[in-house]
């Protein structure tokens, strides 16, 4: 079950490591933002339908709502700026890690599903925050793109804290 988590986290670690060698362009950052949010939307939809714990289901629904909102903001901004999101190794790794996570979650049910979903959310949000802080914000050249990243950061912090609280209530401490 840890494989998709490792793949998604590895993509974000690579992003941080690559930032030292070559910072991502604004077009690549836009693609990373949309992809990272879509990965969490897909997992959230599954949690809404498959979660056995009411709090896990509600958290999944919140992830779908919040991350869909961020994607709408990102798409509106890149449209306004006439920037075409550029696929890159980080987005490819995020997509494959996200698909693998959903595939593995689909095999689980009950409390095992709830724990696996929440564990992934804790790890994923921590790594997304690290990428936002260490790579995406520092690398963004466009002031509006940088502003978007700064403005959505508190929601990622709140999601991480919420997921940690759920993790604790489910008896998991990672």
Where are these predicted regions, by residue range?
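His/Met- and acidic-residue-enriched segments that coordinate or traffic transition-metal cofactors
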Residues: 2-9, 13-174
């Amino acid at each position: 079950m840890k494989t998709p988590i490792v793949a998604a986290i590895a993509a974000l670690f690579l992003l941080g490591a690559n930032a030292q060698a070559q910072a991502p362009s604004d077009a690549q950052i836009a693609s990373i933002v949309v992809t990272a949010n879509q990965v969490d939307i897909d997992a959230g939809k599954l949690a809404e339908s498959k979660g056995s714990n009411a709090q896990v289901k509600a958290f999944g629904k919140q992830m779908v709502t919040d991350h869909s909102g961020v994607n709408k903001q990102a798409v509106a901004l890149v449209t306004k700026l006439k920037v075409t999101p550029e696929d890159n190794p980080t987005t490819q790794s995020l997509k494959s890690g996200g698909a693998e996570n959903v595939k593995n979650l689909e095999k689980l049910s009950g409390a095992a599903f709830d724990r696996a979903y929440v564990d992934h959310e804790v790890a994923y949000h921590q790594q997304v925050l690290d990428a936002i802080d260490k790579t995406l914000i520092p690398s963004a050249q466009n002031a509006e793109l940088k502003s978007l990243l700064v403005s959505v950061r508190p929601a990622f912090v709140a999601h991480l804290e919420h997921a940690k609280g759920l993790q604790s209530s489910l008896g998991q401490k990672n």
